[in-house]
C-alpha cells in the first residue's frame, strides 16, 4: 500500500471514529466473504463494518482522539462504526457471533471511553431506546395517577366521614323523638 493510500485510509477511518456514536471491535478470522456480507446486512444502514490494517486503525484512533483501544488491535480486526442506535447494532453483532462462532467481539468504544467485551454484551442485552422511553413514560403516567388519587383520597374520606356523622346524628335524633 502506497504512503498516500495509507494516509487516505487513516483519514477515512479517523473520520468514521469522529462521526460514530459507538464502535465495536471484532475479530473476523474464519469468516467467509458471504458471512461478512450477511453481517453487514444485519447491521443495517446506520452501521459501517470496516476491515482495516491494525497499524492504520491505531493511527486513525490517535488522530480521532480515541484512547484505550490499542490492545484490541491484534490479529484480523474489523470495526463496526455505529452512527445510529448502539443497542440495535450491538444486538445484531451479538446474534451474529452466536450463530457464527468465528466472529469474536474484542471490545468497543462509546461515550469517550473504551468498552470491555462484557460491557458490549450488556449494551446488546438492553432494550431499544424507544422501548425504554415508552416504559419511562408509562411509569411517569402511572405515578401521576397515583399522586392524583392520593390528593383526592383525603377529600373523599372527609366526605364519607361527614355522611356517616350525619347518618348517626339522624339516627340519634330519631331515637330521641321516639322516646
From Swiss-Prot:
The keyword rRNA-binding applies. GO terms for biological process: translation. Pfam families: Ribosomal_L10. The keyword Cell membrane does not apply. Gene3D superfamilies: 3.30.70.1730. Coiled coil: none annotated. It comes from the Bacteria. GO terms for cellular component: large ribosomal subunit. Keywords: Ribonucleoprotein, Ribosomal protein, RNA-binding, rRNA-binding. InterPro entries: Ribosomal_uL10 (IPR001790), Ribosomal_uL10-like_sf (IPR043141), Ribosomal_uL10_bac (IPR022973), Ribosomal_uL10_bac_type (IPR047865), Ribosomal_uL10_CS_bac (IPR002363). Belongs to the universal ribosomal protein uL10 family. Forms part of the ribosomal stalk, playing a central role in the interaction of the ribosome with GTP-bound translation factors. Part of the ribosomal stalk of the 50S ribosomal subunit. The N-terminus interacts with L11 and the large rRNA to form the base of the stalk. The C-terminus forms an elongated spine to which L12 dimers bind in a sequential fashion forming a multimeric L10(L12)X complex. HAMAP family: Ribosomal_uL10. This is Large ribosomal subunit protein uL10. It comes from Mycolicibacterium vanbaalenii (strain DSM 7251 / JCM 13017 / BCRC 16820 / KCTC 9966 / NRRL B-24157 / PYR-1). The gene is rplJ.
Amino acid at each position: 500500500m502506497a504512503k498516500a493510500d495509507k494516509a487516505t485510509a487513516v483519514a477515512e477511518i479517523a473520520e468514521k471514529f469522529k462521526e460514530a456514536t459507538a464502535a465495536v471491535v471484532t475479530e473476523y478470522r474464519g469468516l467467509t466473504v458471504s458471512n461478512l456480507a450477511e453481517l453487514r446486512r444485519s447491521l443495517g444502514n446506520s452501521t459501517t463494518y470496516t476491515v482495516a490494517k491494525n497499524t492504520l486503525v491505531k493511527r486513525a484512533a490517535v488522530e480521532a482522539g480515541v484512547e484505550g483501544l490499542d490492545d484490541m488491535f491484534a490479529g484480523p480486526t474489523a470495526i463496526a462504526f455505529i452512527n445510529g442506535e448502539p443497542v440495535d447494532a450491538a444486538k445484531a453483532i451479538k446474534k451474529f457471533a452466536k450463530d457464527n462462532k468465528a466472529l469474536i467481539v474484542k471490545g468497543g468504544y462509546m461515550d469517550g471511553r473504551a468498552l470491555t467485551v462484557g460491557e458490549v454484551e450488556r449494551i446488546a442485552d438492553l432494550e431499544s431506546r424507544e422501548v425504554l422511553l415508552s416504559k419511562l413514560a408509562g411509569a411517569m403516567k402511572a405515578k401521576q395517577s397515583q399522586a392524583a388519587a392520593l390528593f383526592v383520597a383525603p377529600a373523599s374520606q372527609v366526605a364519607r366521614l361527614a355522611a356517616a356523622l350525619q347518618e348517626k346524628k339522624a339516627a340519634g335524633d330519631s331515637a330521641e323523638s321516639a322516646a
